[in-house]
């Protein structure tokens, strides 16, 4: 389900149609990415894309589509069919659409001549000699033959400000771009300011909100809200998302007035109160700024106790990062929810002091029959958070001994232990040395006093990526031989099918490890 609420007086923005030309697109042998690229770019420029058509390499069909679109929209942008082979028929279709004749362009020939020597030399080096000259002649003739009334557009290269190396054909309001995505995107980039001058662009305001509600939960209220702004030139879009773990519906708002935007967003926030998601698809980037914003939001919600826990954990990690060089610090990371919180906090403090390109040292103590999903998450998180993870055999004491042997300089080891953990209950303070009969490391447990709910509050509040097993009914992760989905999260639908709620839906923190047989 999707919904779009458009007021009757949306501003008269410039309109556009995109025509994707090529039999290979219709056959499914080539994926069209050009229309997606063009839609994104045109939308940012304030252009209202009203139509996308995919048509084959047929002159009559190209002509009909061009004629229809050219008369109906301000801009028509085609992609594909402008190459040197027999099935490139866009220029012929344009000539037919505008009742024009084809002619050879010396200007294009000059552009071709600039790269032709390199091309022919390369072909000869590959052993292609016989028939090369004739093939080049025919290809050049095809490339250079365009409708007589064509205007050649030379763009501006972004790198050095010089003219583009190859022109684009325009007839009336129709612009013919190449079909190869790299060349299509480059041509648009180079021509953007020429085709859409800054002073002529429609100024629009865009805003996106996310909610953990389904569309059905608020569709009637949203319809009523849209009606309140029907004379204010507002467009509100509602789009469900079935696979995102953080939100269920995305709302987009467009208007030409910043005042109207503020009023609409305020109304939407009131409508969705308690269910707004501050979605972030890359939580590990610009982490310092996002952390401050997160704490500010929690303060506005009067979550004093939670903020105190955030500050305490942050302070502990900061003290370690300030006191020890990074080569002496290691994070114990097994892909679980608690150490994922620690990974985010450590990345925060390392970014703050050293910058985001600085790697973090970590290690993973393996368990028997480990979930492959947990292994994959460790790999993904290592890439996102720039952490180098070594693997050691378990149990913990054995793994720490292997760590000290491999990296003898390690002193503080950050762990996601909490007081409710089987081993966490023996720790009296968040920072303690291991016992004398253990490998000597400084155990640092910044979230020792956190609850299960606190952990999920932070992970989901910041949209920190976590192992997908937690969305499948697992609340605590061990090995596959001793870990099952949590029975309290089991639901049975009316048709008898079994489902499991995600881990953050568990309401009783004391039951967190009821899905583990060895705890």
UniProtKB/Swiss-Prot annotation:
Gene3D superfamilies: HUPs (3.40.50.620), MoaB/Mog-like domain (3.40.980.10). The keyword Chaperone does not apply. Its EC number is 2.7.7.2. Residues 328-485 are annotated as: FAD synthase. Residues 17-108 are annotated as: Molybdenum cofactor biosynthesis protein-like. The keyword Flavoprotein applies. Coiled coil: none annotated. Signal peptide: none annotated. Keywords: ATP-binding, FAD, Flavoprotein, FMN, Nucleotide-binding, Nucleotidyltransferase, Transferase. Its cofactor is Mg(2+). It catalyses: FMN + ATP + H(+) = FAD + diphosphate. One of its GO terms (biological process) is FAD biosynthetic process. Pfam families: FLAD1_M, MoCF_biosynth, PAPS_reduct. One of its GO terms (molecular function) is ATP binding. The molybdenum cofactor biosynthesis protein-like region may not be functional. PANTHER family: FAD SYNTHASE (PTHR23293:SF9), FAD SYNTHETASE-RELATED FMN ADENYLYLTRANSFERASE (PTHR23293). In the N-terminal section; belongs to the MoaB/Mog family. In the C-terminal section; belongs to the PAPS reductase family. FAD1 subfamily. This is Probable FAD synthase. It comes from Caenorhabditis elegans. The gene is flad-1.
């Amino acid at each position: 389900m999707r919904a779009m609420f458009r007021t009757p007086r949306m501003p008269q923005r410039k309109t556009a149609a995109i025509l994707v030309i090529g039999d290979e697109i219709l056959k499914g042998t080539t994926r069209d990415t050009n229309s997606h690229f063009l839609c994104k770019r045109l939308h940012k420029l304030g252009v209202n894309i009203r139509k996308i058509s995919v048509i084959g390499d047929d002159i009559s069909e190209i002509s009909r589509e061009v004629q229809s679109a050219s008369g109906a929209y301000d801009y028509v942008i085609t992609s594909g069919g402008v190459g040197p082979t027999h099935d490139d028929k866009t220029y012929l279709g344009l000539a037919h659409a505008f009742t024009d004749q084809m002619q050879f362009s010396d200007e294009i020939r000059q552009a071709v001549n600039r790269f032709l020597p390199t091309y022919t030399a390369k072909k000869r080096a590959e052993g292609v000699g016989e028939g090369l000259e004739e093939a080049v002649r025919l290809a050049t003739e095809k490339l250079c033959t365009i409708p007589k009334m064509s205007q050649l557009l030379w763009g501006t290269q972004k790198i050095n400000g010089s003219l583009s190396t190859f022109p684009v054909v325009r007839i009336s309001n129709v612009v013919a771009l190449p079909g190869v995505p790299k060349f299509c995107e480059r041509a648009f980039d180079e021509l953007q300011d020429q085709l859409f001058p800054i002073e002529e662009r429609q100024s629009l305001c865009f805003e996106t909100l996310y909610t953990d509600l389904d569309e059905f939960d608020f569709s009637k209220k949203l319809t009523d809200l849209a009606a309140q702004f029907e004379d204010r030139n507002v467009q509100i879009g509602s789009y469900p998302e079935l696979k995102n773990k953080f939100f269920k519906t995305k709302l987009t708002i467009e208007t030409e007035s910043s005042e109207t935007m503020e009023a609409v967003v305020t109304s939407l926030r009131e409508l969705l109160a308690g269910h707004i998601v501050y979605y972030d698809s890359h939580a590990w980037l610009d982490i310092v700024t996002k952390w401050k914003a997160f704490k500010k939001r929690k303060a506005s919600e009067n979550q004093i106790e939670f903020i105190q826990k955030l500050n305490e954990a942050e302070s502990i990690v900061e003290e370690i990062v300030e006191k020890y060089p990074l080569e002496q610090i290691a994070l114990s990371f097994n892909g679980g929810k608690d150490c994922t919180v620690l990974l985010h906090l450590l990345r925060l403090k390392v970014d703050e002091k050293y910058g985001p390109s600085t790697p973090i040292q970590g290690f993973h103590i393996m368990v028997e029959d480990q979930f492959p999903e947990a292994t994959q998450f460790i790999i993904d998180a290592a890439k996102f958070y720039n952490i180098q993870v070594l693997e050691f055999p378990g149990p913990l004491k054995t793994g720490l001994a292997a760590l000290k042997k491999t990296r003898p300089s390690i002193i503080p080891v950050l762990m996601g232990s909490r007081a409710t953990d089987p081993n966490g209950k023996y720790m009296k303070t968040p920072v303690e040395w291991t016992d004398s009969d253990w490998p000597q490391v400084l155990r640092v447990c910044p979230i020792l006093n956190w609850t299960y709910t606190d952990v999920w509050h932070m992970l989901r509040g910041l949209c920190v990526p976590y192992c997908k097993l937690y969305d499948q009914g697992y609340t605590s992760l061990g090995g596959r031989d001793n870990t099952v989905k949590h029975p309290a999260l089991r639901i049975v639908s009316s048709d008898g099918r079994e489902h499991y709620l995600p881990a953050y839906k568990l309401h009783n923190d004391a039951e967190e490890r009821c899905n583990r047989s060895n705890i």
